[in-house]
Curated annotation (Swiss-Prot):
One of its GO terms (biological process) is translation. Located on the platform of the 30S subunit, it bridges several disparate RNA helices of the 16S rRNA. Forms part of the Shine-Dalgarno cleft in the 70S ribosome. It comes from Endomicrobium trichonymphae. GO terms for molecular function: rRNA binding; structural constituent of ribosome. Part of the 30S ribosomal subunit. Interacts with proteins S7 and S18. Binds to IF-3. Keywords: Ribonucleoprotein, Ribosomal protein, RNA-binding, rRNA-binding. Belongs to the universal ribosomal protein uS11 family. Signal peptide: none annotated. PROSITE patterns: RIBOSOMAL_S11 (PS00054). The lineage of its organism: Bacteria, Pseudomonadati, Elusimicrobiota, Endomicrobiia, Endomicrobiales. GO terms for cellular component: ribonucleoprotein complex; ribosome. InterPro entries: Ribosomal_uS11 (IPR001971), Ribosomal_uS11_bac-type (IPR019981), Ribosomal_uS11_CS (IPR018102), Ribosomal_uS11_sf (IPR036967). This is Small ribosomal subunit protein uS11.
């Protein structure tokens, strides 16, 4: 028929049967990215502040980080994830609010670990802004 199309992929969502999933939060001054993986590192769901509908300087706000984390949390709850271990990276303003967003979506948090890279006197930092 003219209105029907054959789907190439399967329309069924796969259920997550593993143990504790891992949530990686990258929080910079300009954006927040949340990625949820299984134990092997395969991505289950991800979102950023831009994907969540925020534009420009609003992407770097704590509210954008909370909404982004909550949307990813709802996605993986639909797949079947119940427990997550959080790995947070970066100095941005959305660090704590992203954790609260994941918690408010109904996910249980087992561990929180900060994996922000710290230089041992490596590269020279950029010059300070004068406004």
């Amino acid at each position: 028929m003219a209105g029907e199309k054959n789907a190439v992929g399967s329309s069924k969502k796969k259920k997550y049967t593993g143990g504790v999933a891992k949530a990686y939060i990258l929080s910079t001054f300009n954006n927040t990215i949340v990625n949820i993986t299984d134990e092997k590192g395969n991505t289950l769901a991800w979102a950023s502040a831009g994907v969540s509908g925020f534009k420009g300087t609003k992407k770097g706000t704590p509210f954008a980080a909370q909404m982004t984390a909550a949307s990813v949390g709802r996605k993986v709850m639909g797949i079947g994830v119940k427990q997550i271990a959080i790995f947070i990276k970066g100095p941005g303003p959305g660090r704590e609010t992203a954790i609260r967003g994941l918690q408010s979506s109904g996910l249980g948090i087992t561990t929180i670990k900060d994996i922000t890279p710290v230089p041992h006197d490596g590269c020279r930092p950029p010059k300070l802004r004068r406004v």
